[in-house]
Amino acid sequence: MQKNVREIAVLMQDKEKEYKICEKLRRQPELSGLKILCREQLQSLGPSETFNKRLKRLEPLAGRVLLTDLRDTELPEVVKNIPSIGYGFDYRGSAKYVVENTDSIDKMYLETVYCRYYRLPLEIAETDRLILREMQLTDLDSLYEVYDTLRDCPYIEPLYERAEEEEFTRQYIKNMYGFFEHGLWLVIRKEDNKVIGRAGIENREIDGELQKELGYLIGKPWQGKGYAAEACLAILDYVKERELCSHLFLCCHQKNIPSISLAQKLGFTVYAEDIDGMNLYVCSIN
């Protein structure tokens, strides 16, 4: 899995509170392997300016995330340009991510904060053969190659023309990944880093309510090898772990037998049939 974050720097108004938070983070099994540093530890390395000298080395992609309850004006200048998480219900800073306690902080959460700040594609899941990650504009050539192998498939809508697809992708990254924290992700074969498809979670209005829908496609040369099932099982685990929803839907053409077979294998059951030639399936997440 993606391992950008290596260190959490904790800065709190109250030193005792800061120490307790650091100790709690160190005891959380899901954060094992990460360095947890508070102001006192850094200052003990030398004179008072040691802390700021250390922070000046916090360069982009250095692997640090700041957890703080300080206002922006109270932060040392050099930590205003690293990924930050606000702490406490009364936090008044500008961090886009805020937690009331440390229970929700795990490595995936830290990676999300880090990647959003530096506009990096977030890795969602890793299986024996695959990596699922968010796409970026530089992936478009690979995506066009995948869709070109499916040009004769009646169930797949083609991509837009290049300029329009680039703009669509920019907005998708900003609004789906950035706001909803899910979307369609790239399916990448680990052995050669080849993009072989897409799979992920989209939004769909069903019976007047916004629901989560599983979607997937694998390029023709890589079909029949179990890649779709492997990717979808990883997504179901991700949805369960992140508690994204209690039910997940899936929509496919009623004549798309391989897709129907996969849906049933994944535990989906019929929710509605023959809606303009499409079947709707549902799966309980528990």
Regions inferred by a protein language model and the residue ranges of each:
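Conserved beta-strand-loop-alpha-helix junction that forms the acyl-donor binding cleft
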Residues: 249-260
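Conserved SAM-binding loop
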Residues: 66-68, 132, 252
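Glycine-rich acyl-CoA binding loop
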Residues: 224-229
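GNAT-family acyltransferases
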Residues: 1-11, 24-32, 100-221, 234-238, ...
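Asp-based, Mg2+/Mn2+-dependent phosphohydrolase catalytic module
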Residues: 1-125
